[in-house]
């Protein structure tokens, strides 16, 4: 059995709201651009809504395809977050 697609995320409790952080959505390249990602996002939204979530957050690769996909699903670029990172050892990236 092959795994063609999955969503991975977790719940975050803030003072006044419950959020869901969409950590990863993966679709096998054979199934991309066929509506599966949109269907997964919708199913995830339905599930987290039932559990009381009022905000979904994510971070994404900064390219046109990813931005278009998430905007098409109703997400927006948040002005109040700055992605940051720190390498803990030398890397070629």
Name the predicted role of every residue range.
Residues 10, 28, 59, 81:
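Conserved residues at the C-terminal ends of beta-strands
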Residues 85-92:
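Short beta-strand-to-coil "C-cap" segments at the C-terminal boundary of structured domains/repeats
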Residues 38, 50, 54, 62-80, ...:
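Conserved active-site alpha-helix within GNAT-family acetyltransferase domains
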Residues 1-17, 23:
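Acetyl-CoA-dependent GNAT
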Residues 22, 56-60:
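Conserved hydrophobic beta-strand within the GNAT/NAT acetyltransferase core sheet
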Residues 27, 33-46, 72:
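Conserved acetyl-CoA-binding loop-helix of GNAT-fold acetyltransferases
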Residues 22, 44-48, 66:
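Short hydrophobic clusters on alpha-helical segments that form packing/core surfaces
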């Amino acid at each position: 059995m092959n795994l063609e697609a999955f969503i991975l995320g977790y719940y975050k409790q803030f003072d006044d709201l419950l959020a869901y952080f969409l950590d990863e959505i993966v679709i096998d390249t054979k199934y991309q651009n066929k509506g599966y990602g949109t269907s997964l996002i919708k199913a995830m939204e339905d599930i987290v809504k039932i559990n009381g979530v009022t905000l979904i957050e994510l971070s994404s690769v900064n390219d046109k395809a990813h931005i278009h996909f998430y905007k098409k699903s109703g997400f927006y670029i948040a002005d109040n977050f700055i992605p940051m990172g720190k390498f803990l050892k030398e890397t070629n990236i």
